[in-house]
Amino acid sequence: MRTILLSFDEKWYPVLKRGEKIFEHRRKFCNEEVRAYLYLGKPRQQIVAEIGLGKRELLEDWLQQYQEEKEVADRISDFMRRNKFAMKVLWFKEIEPINIIEVQELFPELKIPISFHFLDKKPDVLKWLDDNKHYTGYQIENDFSNVGRDNICVL
């Protein structure tokens, strides 16, 4: 499984952490299951969690699947204005915040991603993060057995 550094909007972090946001939506994304270090931008500028993301799914396919349900199809269409894919958030593990500025001082080649970067291409950075992260003990694993129309394109 590949590892990425994923930029994430602070406003969505609480619902992700609570397990309410079970899909991540992006315009571009890799086509495989990944482990992601979650980076929150300004003002925090910290890596705060590790999450597992499932293989991408086309929102276009969801639109086909739910075309007979107007409310759901409208939500999907709205999300499609900004995104192309949805990925299941498989699990979430909170870590003690890691200041990105300190990481960049150690590894000046590390740039803050607009969306995401593959950390596998920066093995020294990945090793440092893996060796220096400290889990807080808070973690969740999302259950997708009862996912349905009410969970599609809501957060």
Which residues does each PLM region occupy?
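Contiguous surface segments at macromolecular interaction interfaces
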Residues: 1-29, 45-48, 56-155
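Short coil-to-beta transition motif at edge beta-strands of beta-rich domains
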Residues: 28-38
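Short acidic, glycine-rich loop/turn motifs
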Residues: 40-42
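Binuclear metal-dependent hydrolase catalytic cores
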Residues: 51
